[in-house]
């Protein structure tokens, strides 16, 4: 079996794994929140192969731009490159698999400082026109932003989902239920990842049960719709 086929199957299998329970989905989102520059399928494959990854880049970028050498024996994280006519594999390495040489540097990994919270809260309130009730804390504001983002893009997120649902648990659900559950899952997932990026604890507002419907997205074909919604923020 070719390596390309192995990675395709890994994506399918891992989609089933991360959608098997709320806790598994949250574990995936912990990784994805750190790798927000990557699209969903890349995030999924990175989580499958290196769940603790914090900053990934190609060998060339590490060597030529960051002056960090990849450690001898380090295993690259295989990703699917579907930009051309034929799908092929490309490889990235996490920063933990590199070491700095003369002139080298580390990528900037943003972390919110406590003194920045008020500034970020003010910016969100102005940018999204948040009501006063949604600006009591940064967590409240992030939840309001997540709701607004999903409300604005719900039709785009759902476009084509009904055709992909065949053979999945979604197939037995009616359109109204799918729409309602997707909206809530997407909102809570976006909020969860926004909180993780800001160093906040999302479970102060959420409970595991809020992600109970993730098990309906038991195939890559349908999980991709939810994953894309959460990763495009």
PLM feature segments, named:
Residues 1-233:
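N-terminal accessory/interface modules of nucleic-acid-binding and processing proteins
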